[in-house]
């Protein structure tokens, strides 16, 4: 008997969590919480399960060994990864759509996401001062380019990745900014 793959079953579970993020029978604030739970679940899924599958697939490929099939589902690590990725891409597209809809509904309740360009002068001064006094002192951005290797990224930490344009056309570098756990969220 072949069973349902554990990883694919887990993605189905997280799809049900995501569905609560668009369920009109669930209060709006709770919908947003379910979207956050979905994201947190997916982060952990990639750190633990997808990470170990990737290691197994790489090991099997590098040793030119016959790929080991899971005895319950008869799938190799590479086959599991190939099944996970498109399913995850669709779930993430759905999450993005639900999040955009939730932002619209929150705006109807008086909550809105404001771009920096649309702040009042008073708010702009406040946030610039806040950045300079509270955030800037604890930021430690890192550049990744041909002279600077990719840094070690700690597990369960939050990072902001930024593409930096250089003076030369089509030249880009990657900037990585660790978001300190000292920062209030």
Model regions and ranges:
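N-terminal non-catalytic structural scaffold regions of very large proteins
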Residues: 1-185
């Amino acid at each position: 008997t072949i069973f349902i793959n554990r990883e694919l079953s887990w993605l189905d579970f997280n799809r049900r969590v995501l569905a609560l993020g668009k369920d009109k029978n669930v209060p709006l604030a709770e919908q947003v919480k379910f979207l956050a739970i979905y994201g947190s679940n997916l982060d952990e899924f990639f750190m633990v399960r997808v990470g170990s599958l990737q290691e197994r697939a790489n090991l099997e490929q590098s040793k030119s060994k016959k790929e080991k099939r899971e005895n319950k589902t008869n799938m190799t690590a590479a086959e599991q990864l190939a099944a996970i990725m498109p399913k995850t891409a669709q779930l993430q597209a759905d999450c993005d759509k639900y999040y955009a809809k939730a932002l619209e509904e929150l705006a109807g309740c008086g909550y809105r996401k404001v771009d920096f360009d649309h702040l009042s002068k008073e708010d702009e001064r406040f946030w610039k001062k806040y950045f300079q006094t509270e955030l800037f002192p604890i930021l430690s951005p890192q550049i990744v380019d041909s002279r600077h290797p990719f840094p070690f990224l700690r597990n369960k930490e939050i990072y902001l990745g930024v593409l930096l344009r250089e003076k030369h056309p089509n030249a880009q570098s990657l900037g990585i900014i660790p978001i300190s756990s000292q920062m209030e969220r």
